[in-house]
Amino acid sequence: MTTQQEEQRSDTKNSKSESPSEVLVDTLDSKSNGSSDDDNIGQSEELSDKEIYTVEDRPPEYWAQRKKKFVLDVDPKYAKQKDKSDTYKRFKYLLGVTDLFRHFIGIKAKHDKNIQKLLKQLDSDANKLSKSHSTVSSSSRHHRKTEKEEDAELMADEEEEIVDTYQEDIFVSESPSFVKSGKLRDYQVQGLNWLISLHENKLSGILADEMGLGKTLQTISFLGYLRYVKQIEGPFLIIVPKSTLDNWRREFLKWTPNVNVLVLHGDKDTRADIVRNIILEARFDVLITSYEMVIREKNALKRLAWQYIVIDEAHRIKNEQSALSQIIRLFYSKNRLLITGTPLQNNLHELWALLNFLLPDIFGDSELFDEWFEQNNSEQDQEIVIQQLHSVLNPFLLRRVKADVEKSLLPKIETNVYVGMTDMQIQWYKSLLEKDIDAVNGAVGKREGKTRLLNIVMQLRKCCNHPYLFEGAEPGPPYTTDEHLIFNSGKMIILDKLLKRLKEKGSRVLIFSQMSRLLDILEDYCYFRDFEYCRIDGSTSHEERIEAIDEYNKPNSEKFVFLLTTRAGGLGINLVTADTVILFDSDWNPQADLQAMDRAHRIGQKKQVHVYRFVTENAIEEKVIERAAQKLRLDQLVIQQGTGKKTASLGNSKDDLLDMIQFGAKNMFEKKASKVTVDADIDDILKKGEQKTQELNAKYQSLGLDDLQKFNGIENQSAYEWNGKSFQKKSNDKVVEWINPSRRERRREQTTYSVDDYYKEIIGGGSKSASKQTPQPKAPRAPKVIHGQDFQFFPKELDALQEKEQLYFKKKVNYKVTSYDITGDIRNEGSDAEEEEGEYKNAANTEGHKGHEELKRRIEEEQEKINSAPDFTQEDELRKQELISKAFTNWNKRDFMAFINACAKYGRDDMENIKKSIDSKTPEEVEVYAKIFWERLKEINGWEKYLHNVELGEKKNEKLKFQETLLRQKIEQCKHPLHELIIQYPPNNARRTYNTLEDKFLLLAVNKYGLRADKLYEKLKQEIMMSDLFTFDWFIKTRTVHELSKRVHTLLTLIVREYEQPDANKKKRSRTSATREDTPLSQNESTRASTVPNLPTTMVTNQKDTNDHVDKRTKIDQEA
């Protein structure tokens, strides 16, 4: 026994607290030890020395029984079917809570007669109760109960109370004794009771307390309750982010040290050793692993009968289509618990995804769930929706915030610090806008528009942080660590002033940023200012992460600053030794910023936490902050206040991105941007930030759900509004200004058409000098260019016709070719001859006279093409439409890949099966496409790859046909294949783990379905599970689909080898037959044969072969 265990036993002996949970534990212990209740009060963990085992001391019978409980002997989906009694109890409880669940349960009842009976029984009980009430009400109002009636009613109440007493679980009123190293707070005890009630009613749930309220401790306490009170030792699976693996292990060691916790992590060999020697041998209670490890080790984890699956940061599975969500749904578990501080991020469909994971038998249809919360405009309907949402969420969701439950934790003070830009930042910001001025003005296509705008947004946000994030911006080489790191970024100027003040006050600071390269700059800054620091980002190893956290949190640590990336450092890290959080930039998802703040603002924090969020004023970051406030307000309305309207996703659309980019852009070009200098007063900046933060919060707190559904929650702003002015084109009497680069303005005569002016007018721009009375001439519409996909097989003649049409249009509008048309460089584009001549001089200076002459020659050639372009006639237009109709314009990429896959699966000549496999096209369409495809295959980019895939599929198909034929012929030669079929095993087959009967069964099943059958090996698995031959054959019943496919492949290889070497195998066949005819059945196989109808007990098999492999049943070896 360890010293730690002796100390714990000594502590528990001296403890005399008598909580209800402890009484129950003591009762259970007294039954096993034969002692009285009074002797065991407060000794929930004290067992006799004989009963306190180490792993090695446990008797073999204990491990055998434990392994039987931990490891499934059937497929998880069949094991789930055995839990129907839990399902009925769960349904009955939920129907008692609210009749709204009948909508969901009614769907399940259509396929389950027992659920139908349950619903009828509940309806019958309700009708009886209704009739009794109606009878009483219809009688005289002076009617008094007789003694007999009252006695009957009292007896019924007593009986019901007795039943409830036996069924009700013990209510925990204070911190239970099995929780060591501290006590649960009152609200944590309430959370433990809530988890216990979920367990008793066979429900899964979502523990959604605000970050920092001790969700980890509540979960560990609940698992301790299951272990020490309910005698459920496990197995429990806890899936957490990689960064919190060690934190969870430490928490278990601290609060419930006697629980056997295993962390599944490491390289492939290490994990394989853990799975083989610990997990599958049931030598653990709680398994902690990461999301990535669950995906990699799914086959091993799927074999255990989990009592609980706990998922930390459960919003990771909000997408039910993700790999993690789908894999975890395959696991067997009695119950599931989700832990998240952010239950709602975007919309209610994500909340449904979490509920669907917890209770798939109830929340199986997302459309039905969404229909519940469709909301009309009337206030009465809104009230009904709110009530419905509360009724649905109450049994599953527990959500509490710090302000309501944790009175000792001071509220954090958040301040948005609005910062101007330095001259260098302004210059880079303008340059980024000018680089893609068309996109800034909204002149982007639908297909590439959002990606193009996202790229601009990313670059602008980098500029707001520090211009040195761009290659070539930092002066050098040589590169120096000097004051220029600070005075070239507005945020760095304010950070420098703020950190100096915090250092004097004795505060300690966490600095978060999305960009790890910015942390590099901050590292240089800390080195320059002699600030001791730690750092964590996405590339930090698990060991280095733990070391950095311990170093920062140790008593009297010299570390002043902790640098973290928002995503890598915002999960599961306890840094309460810091009292100041600086968000250098804001995450798109406001919940990520909240998680970052709560690394310091959590239980255990004794100081007031200040959060400073840096925001670049009059730039894109202001819009990002408004977007974050909108999302947080939505969370507050839907979850914390119960407003249940179905909400549209608040993702960033193209208009949203455009609005962010345009915000403050005009001020940049007009030299009105907010500036900051080294002399800025930090007090004035903080005071201004506090005021603007209060205004922003007040604005969004006053908004309702309908207001939040608008673009950005303020009045009727759209993507065309910035600086309080609307630039959207409303009518002809108000012409909108186009945002022009600061370098120059373009001047063109209005008497001729210009393509640039034409597009400006279409998008919403125009000339300042346009008057209300002078109508502008309408520019002709540019002809649409069809850019077809290569697999759509447009006729080659179409390209020539489209070029002819484009040249004719340019000739018609007097289009002048510029250097931009040749080089694609906006710096070379001119608007008149004078500008072009000046640019030619610049080109000559930079690239030489030869480059200038070549550019001029190419411009002249292109202009000559336009000037001499022939007319595009009506006949040309008709011919163009005719050519377009010949292309396969209704075939998309998905249809094309479906055709390729079908050709690979069935062979290019099997048109019947190819037609059937493409559901989106008629058989005639597929046939016509196939003909053109094989004629013009080489016109497709990467045609060699597609052809190679088809040829590989055809070869595989031929091989399968050949194997099918050999197998069928071999089986047809036997009158009773299961008895007489002979498999020619190789001479060296000592490692073979399948016996002859299992191999024969697999071959007969494959012959039954065919090698090319869909889901062949799932069908084989089903045949094995349903066959009486293998009732007690644990080995074959626990083979996975992948293992069965490998075995079938090996057997087919043996059959092919037998066919290819007939002479060599002929002698073997005769010897084997002679031996097997004289060999009696093994006792095991004889018993199986007698239990199967029409299976003679004289089935010929090899007894020696069977006996050799009996001892190998529990091994999973690699096959030869």
UniProtKB/Swiss-Prot annotation:
Its main location: nucleus. Component of the ISW2 complex, which at least consists of ISW2, ITC1, DLS1 and DPB4. May form a stable subcomplex with ITC1. Catalytic component of the ISW2 complex, which acts in remodeling the chromatin by catalyzing an ATP-dependent alteration in the structure of nucleosomal DNA. The ISW2 complex is involved in coordinating transcriptional repression and in inheritance of telomeric silencing. It is involved in repression of MAT a-specific genes, INO1, and early meiotic genes during mitotic growth dependent upon transcription factor UME6 and in a parallel pathway to the RPD3-SIN3 histone deacetylase complex. The gene is ISW2. The modification Phosphoserine is found at residues 17, 19, 831, 1082. It is an enzyme of class 3 (hydrolase). Transmembrane segments: none annotated. It holds the Pfam family HAND. GO terms for biological process: cellular response to pheromone; chromatin remodeling; negative regulation of antisense RNA transcription; negative regulation of transcription by RNA polymerase II; positive regulation of transcription by RNA polymerase II; rDNA heterochromatin formation; regulation of DNA-templated transcription; subtelomeric heterochromatin formation. This is ISWI chromatin-remodeling complex ATPase ISW2. Residues 1-16, 47-58, 1105-1120 have a biased composition (Basic and acidic residues). A motif (DEAH box) lies at residues 312-315.
